[in-house]
Amino acid sequence: MRSGRTVDEFGRQNNFAIEPQVVVAEADASWGFHDRAEKLNGRLAMIGFVALILTEVALGQGLLPFLASGLS
């Protein structure tokens, strides 16, 4: 370990604090906004959008009119 003492040109000791190494702690990757969650959310949104388009093509009408026709 490095000592925090130096001697200047006049022979006087200069004691100073040694700064610790800065360590960036990674956030907990199991919760919150992180790359894995954002990618999963985007992929699920794309799958849902494609499923909606395929449903509209198969039924010949939009999803909202189809749901409204079932209510009447």
UniProtKB/Swiss-Prot annotation:
Signal peptide: none annotated. This is High light-inducible protein HliA. The chain crosses the membrane at residues 47-67. It comes from Synechococcus elongatus (strain ATCC 33912 / PCC 7942 / FACHB-805) (Anacystis nidulans R2). Its main location: membrane. A high light-inducible protein involved in photosystem II (PSII) assembly and/or repair under stress. Binds chlorophyll and carotenoids, protecting against photo-oxidation during PSII assembly. The gene is hliA. GO terms for molecular function: pigment binding. GO terms for cellular component: photosystem II; plasma membrane-derived thylakoid membrane.
